[in-house]
């Protein structure tokens, strides 16, 4: 296939269409700094904190204090990398009404900064926590607290 193949207009058209399509998909490589919709944000963060509390051995439950950053990547679903600040509440693990728990007072205050990779297919309400890492807030840089 030398230079002569480009004389065929059909081959030229196919090559142009393929390069345009490949260029379109290359723009979506990697994670993008995009805002989540409020609905997706709430459901993703609720899933995260429930997963964290279920895996934690702490006496008190945590709740999300603040979303610091979110990034997304489209795959077969949506992958989110979320960085959040979470804090101890006054509710203990066995409390049933934990949806509106107030944060601990200064004496027992404990805050963590967590970065998590969450895979979701929000259209079927499916969530999976793929990776999570948390540090105490005082050990993290000021811009993340």
Curated annotation (Swiss-Prot):
- Gene Ontology BP, a term: signaling receptor ligand precursor processing
Primary localization class, coarse: secreted
Name the GO cellular-component terms.
extracellular region
Q: Name one GO molecular function term.
A: cysteine-type endopeptidase inhibitor activity
Give the signal peptide range.
1-19
Specify whether tRNA processing is a keyword of the entry: no
This chain belongs to the protein called: Cystatin-like 1
| Keyword Glycoprotein (UniProt) | yes
- PANTHER family found in the cross-reference section: CYSTATIN-LIKE 1 (PTHR47887:SF1)
Glycosylation, residue list: 42
Q: Which UniProt keywords apply?
A: Disulfide bond, Glycoprotein, Protease inhibitor, Secreted, Signal, Thiol protease inhibitor
Name the family the entry cites.
Answer: Belongs to the cystatin family.
């Amino acid at each position: 296939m030398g230079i002569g193949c480009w004389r065929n207009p059909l081959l030229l058209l196919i090559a142009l269409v393929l390069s345009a399509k490949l260029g379109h998909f290359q723009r979506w490589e990697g994670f993008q700094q995009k805002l989540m919709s409020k609905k997706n944000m709430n459901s993703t963060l609720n899933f995260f904190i429930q997963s964290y509390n279920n895996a934690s051995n702490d006496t008190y439950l945590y709740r999300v204090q603040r979303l610091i950053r979110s990034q997304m990547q489209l795959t077969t679903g949506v992958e989110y990398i979320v960085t959040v600040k979470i804090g101890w509440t006054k509710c203990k693990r066995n409390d049933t009404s934990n949806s509106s728990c107030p944060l601990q007072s200064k004496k027992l205050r404990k805050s963590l900064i967590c970065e998590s990779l969450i895979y979701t297919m929000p259209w079927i309400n499916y969530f999976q926590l793929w990776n999570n890492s948390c540090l105490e807030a005082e050990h993290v840089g000021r811009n993340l607290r």
